Amino acid sequence: MSTHILPEAFTQPQPCSQPPKEVHLVTPSERQVPYSGHVKPFIMVTTRPEHEAARDEYESFLTQSGLSRNELQHIALEEVDFFGSFTAADVSGVLIGASPYNADTPTAEKTRSQLHVEDQVRELLAVILKEGIPLLATGVVLQVLAAYLGTGTREEFGEELGAVDLFLTAEGREDPVLAGLPQAVTVFAGHYEGVGEVPAHATLLASSPDCPVQMLRVGRNVYACQFNPELDAARFEQRVNIYDEAGYGDPDMSEDILSHARSSEVHDAGQIIRNFVSHFSRT
């Protein structure tokens, strides 16, 4: 697998274009208060082909972020050309959601939709890395980013859908986007493959027993996590039900998954989204 050459600024931790600032830990009770209208918007990019799931994902990120709809604008890669809509100077940052696609599906077996989305994500990652745009990506996008940096995925690092225990590394405990989280965190996740090695130029921030690379950072402002920080227990149940209705899941198995999820003490991983927004918002 070929490795893309990163701009020199990304081979070592460098300051982003805006001066670093302290993170204000936004609490759940504060998160509905919109940011100032002078802040440049964040862009939420959804990669899911199912419209209901994509809308639900946007609403989950919106709720967790504390932004208004104008401050967190939604783009579905299936429908809109990101680069025809925004430039790096227009935005505070980008958030990219997960999808039901598997990065290691043989090319001949991938749908046209998956191929299009993967091409768009790779192109978007290239621009983000080149321009230094702050990014928070989730799910399969971590795998696409790892592949872009020369590291593949393996099925042995997949995790069943449900609550997952992960642990912050020393670097993760010092990172402003993970500020306020305990060293051991329980979150929602579920994926067929995972990344087992930290890619070149990346810093490992969180790991789990079954998936060594749960969250990483490239440079100072590009983040990717394998889990779903936007999901709380209610949103997780809603997401599972949406995919059941779309014919992806087994209702009996889903009930077992939901029963286990209801009994799990999941942390407020949405703090990651709020920290990201607080740290990288710019005028």
PLM feature spans:
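Amide-donor transfer/coupling interface in amidating biosynthetic enzymes
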Residues: 3, 27-38, 44, 90, ...
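Acidic, Ala/Val/Gly-enriched low-complexity intrinsically disordered segments
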Residues: 8-9, 22-26, 33
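N-terminal beta1-alpha1 ligand-phosphate binding loop
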Residues: 34-38, 42-57, 62-66, 76-78
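Glycine/Thr-rich phosphate-binding loops of Rossmann-like dinucleotide-binding domains
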Residues: 52, 103-105, 146
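Flexible gly/pro-rich beta->alpha loop and the following alpha-helix that scaffold active-site loops
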Residues: 70-136
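Ligand/cofactor pocket segment of small-molecule handling proteins
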Residues: 141-144, 148-188
